[in-house]
């Protein structure tokens, strides 16, 4: 009888310890657009959203294999689609959240497509002006909505908010694009504007939100740095398929984005 009681007690203790361990498990949720899913790396384990094992969320997962990892990122995501189909992955037991968002709200793809055309066939300046107006006047409120929704779902979660790199170095080495140096400068200025808006929104969100700037890491590694397709170039220029264009390559995630998030999570 005594041995059976001891066995019962041990079973209860083991159950409690297992339950406690499960309750304390760290949960990491990755949200965001193509700069988080891994478009540009050319290798996807979930093709419909272009989620890659080479993207920074997966690299962070590999550094913390004991964590529960939920990858809700999806290429093409906007603030609206993040709220509609991604943020539900954030639950009260979430410990870490990362995201990039806002580029598609500003019409990033349209702007790049317009500015890549010859000057006589495009309205690059108008496209940039329109994007900058959205970034300044519309995006702040949308980012606040995203951040408030994350906070309401996981009040204790630590949230790492990332920006977008400057794409260009002042030259165009691709055969079928026609970016002028002045257009590249304005596009880089738009990345800087995006940075300031994203950073300000993260600050407004409170102490649990940390903004990480990736722009410095990509200096010297923009499109055409070292020549098209070189190892120095961490961002793809015009690519085939075209959807891979103007996104971080494997090296951009490994050396640009991943250190930014890992520097916070450890």
Model-derived features with residue positions:
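Bacterial N-terminal signal peptides that target proteins for export
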Residues: 1-9
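Serine-esterase "nucleophile elbow" of acetyl-processing enzymes
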Residues: 24-73, 88, 117
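Structural recognition of the beta-strand scaffold that forms the well-ordered cores
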Residues: 27-38, 68-73, 95-100, 105-107, ...
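Oxyanion-hole/transition-state-stabilizing segment in secreted/luminal serine hydrolases
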Residues: 39, 81-135, 166-168
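A structural motif corresponding to the C-terminal end of an alpha-helix
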Residues: 61-67, 141-160, 193-212
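Catalytic His-Asp segment of secreted/periplasmic serine-dependent ester chemistry enzymes
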Residues: 165-266
């Amino acid at each position: 009888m005594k041995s059976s009681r001891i066995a019962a007690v041990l079973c209860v203790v083991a159950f409690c310890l297992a339950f406690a361990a499960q309750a304390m498990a760290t949960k990491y949720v990755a949200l965001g657009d193509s700069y988080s899913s891994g478009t540009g790396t050319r290798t996807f384990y979930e093709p419909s959203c272009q989620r890659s094992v080479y993207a920074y969320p997966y690299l962070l997962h590999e550094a913390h294999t004991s964590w529960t990892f939920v990858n809700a990122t999806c290429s093409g995501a906007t603030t609206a689609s993040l709220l509609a189909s991604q943020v539900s992955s954030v639950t009260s037991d979430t410990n870490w959240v990362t995201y990039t968002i806002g580029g598609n709200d500003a019409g990033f793809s349209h702007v790049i497509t317009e500015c890549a055309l010859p000057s006589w066939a495009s309205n690059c300046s108008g496209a940039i002006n329109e994007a900058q107006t959205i970034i300044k006047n519309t995006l702040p409120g949308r980012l606040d909505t995203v951040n408030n929704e994350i906070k309401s779902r996981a009040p204790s979660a630590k949230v790492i908010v990332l920006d977008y790199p400057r794409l260009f170095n002042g030259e165009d080495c691709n055969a079928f694009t026609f970016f002028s140096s002045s257009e590249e400068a304005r596009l880089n200025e738009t990345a800087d504007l995006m940075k300031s808006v994203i950073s300000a929104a993260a600050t407004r969100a409170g102490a649990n939100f940390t903004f990480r700037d990736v722009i410095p890491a990509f200096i010297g590694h923009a499109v055409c740095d070292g020549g098209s397709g070189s190892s120095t170039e961490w961002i793809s220029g015009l690519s085939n398929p075209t959807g891979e264009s103007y996104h971080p390559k494997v090296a951009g995630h490994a050396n640009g984005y991943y250190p930014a998030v890992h520097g916070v999570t450890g």
